[in-house]
Amino acid sequence: MKTSTKIVGCSLFILLSSCGAYFNQPVTVQKASYGEGTPATISLKSLPPPKEQIVVGVYKFRDQTGQYKPSDNGSNFSTAVTQGSTSILIKALEDSKWFIPIERENLANLLQERNIIRSTRQEYLKDTNSKDQQLTPLLYAGVLLEGGIVSYDSNIITGGFGARYFGAGSSTSYRQDRVTVYLRLVSTQNGKILKTIYVSKTILSQSLDASLFRYVKFKRLLEVETGFTKNEPLQLAVTEAIEKAVEGLIVEGIQDNIWVANAPISTLTEVINEYNKE
C-alpha cells in the first residue's frame, strides 16, 4: 500500500512539474521582434576585419533537396526547408563585414528600373540645355558565391522512454534531423573554384507527456493529462549552418592567402587554430 502511494505521489509530482509548460504558455499577443541570432552569429561578427572588403555576387543560393513536409492528411506542397536561403546568405555576408554583396538575385528588376530612370530623364530634359546626368555604373563582382541546401535528412535518430504503473505514468520521445549546406567561392576572372565549404547542422525535437488514470473512490475517477513539445526552428538551423559556412570560408581564405585580414599574426593564428579544432 505504501509503495503504491509513493508511486502515485511521484506521478503527481511529474504531472505538476509538466504543468509548468501549460501555465507558462503564451496566451497574450506577442509583439514583433527583430531576427534572432544564433551562436554562429556571434562568432561570425567577432572575426578580425579585412584589409579590404570583397565585392561578391550571389545569384541564387537555393534549396536543392526537393523535399516536402511530411503530412498525414494527404498531399502537402509546403517545402521541408526555407526557400529564402539567398536572403539569409546575403545577411550573413553583411554581418561578417568582409564582403560587399551586390544585387544579383533580381537583377532584371534593377536593370528595368535603371532603364526607366534613363528614359524619364531623356523625356523631361530634351527641351533644356542642361546635360543629362548619367547613372553611375553598376558594381561588378570579383567573386561569386554558389551552392545551396543540398540535403535534409529526417529522423536520423529517434527514441523515447515511458513507464506506467496502476494508471499513472509518463513518457518522453525525441527526434533528430539534419540539414547540410554547401558554399563555394568562384573567381569571375577565370571561373576557378577557389574554395568549397560544407556544414551540417542537427535539428532536435523533443516531447514529454504524463497522465494519471485512477479510481480514487467508488465511482470516482481521476484522470489528468499534460505534456509539451519543443521543436528547434528549422529556419534558425539553416541560418546557423549558412553563417558557419561563411565563417569557414573567411578563415580558410585567410589560411590559403586568398585574402588578407587587418589583424596581427598572433590573432590570426589563434583564429585559425580555433577553427581547425572544430
PLM segments and residue spans:
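Short alpha-helical segments and helix-capping/turn motifs at coil-helix boundaries
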Residues: 1, 39-43, 129-131
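Bacterial N-terminal signal peptides that target proteins for export
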Residues: 1-8
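Hydrophobic helical h-region of N-terminal Sec-dependent signal peptides
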Residues: 9-13
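C-terminal motif of bacterial Sec signal peptides marking the signal peptidase cleavage site
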Residues: 15-18
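C-terminal/domain-edge helix-coil "capping" segments
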Residues: 20-52, 153, 160-161, 172-278
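N-terminal segment of the mature soluble domain
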Residues: 54-55, 59-155, 178, 184-195
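"Short basic amphipathic alpha-helical interaction patches in structured regions
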Residues: 72-74, 159-167
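Extracellular loop and loop/strand-boundary signature of outer-membrane beta-barrel proteins
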Residues: 132, 167-171
